[in-house]
Amino acid sequence: EEVSEMETQQDAGQADSIYVVSMDRATEQLQIISIPRDTIAEIEVFNPAGKSLGMTDNHINLQYAYGDGKEKSCELMKTAVSKLLHGIPIQGYYSMNTMGISEVGKLVGDIEIVVPDNSLEEHDPYFKEGAKVVINGDNVEEFLRYRDIEKSQSALVRQQRQKTYLKALIPRIQEKMKINPSFIGNLLKEIEPYTVTNMGNDIFVKLLNAAGNSTLDTQNVPGEGVEGQIYDEYHVNEEELYKLVLSTFYTIS
């Protein structure tokens, strides 16, 4: 479904993968923080008519569902993530629905990666742990999205596959930009029907350039996965998170 067709909470869906990307303007390096979708955090709840019912602690991925699948959902997520990270201001957001995943895979082309674990092997033997495989538009959604919902913390395990692909995807986009400087603009235009953002193409170019100076290692919000009464939960280690926020966003002299 294209984003333009979304209007209500019923259309919005949940936030499946949540990343915070920070660029150090002095060093022009990126740091990436991954927030597990089942993280228990303070979110704002709304009734179907859009009236706020106040704040509650729940899975952070649900915050997106209380919006409209467009700007409102993104703004709600931006606020929830900022609160989780001790009030760090977040300037921009970029959201892509599942329809855009295979489109990115088609436009970027074949990417070779090493399968990081065995979480997909039973479902698809092609993705055997340690195997070198090719990810493209035909199988990228399977690689990034599939999880066994019968297994506890399957979303947390799946996150490692997403990190692996992201780390390989960015250099491939950089390679294509060297050959064709307009590639990123064309890519963003092609997937625009499936995305919501308040950032211009120039910001993406800056971030991609900064990625070339970075290791692209992704840090998880510190915590542990636990089994809730109904669904999996991820409980944040607040002390370790505070240390991560300080080391990522502040210069301590």
Q: What are the residue ranges of the model-derived segments?
A:
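Non-catalytic, solvent-exposed segments at the cell envelope interface
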Residues: 1-253
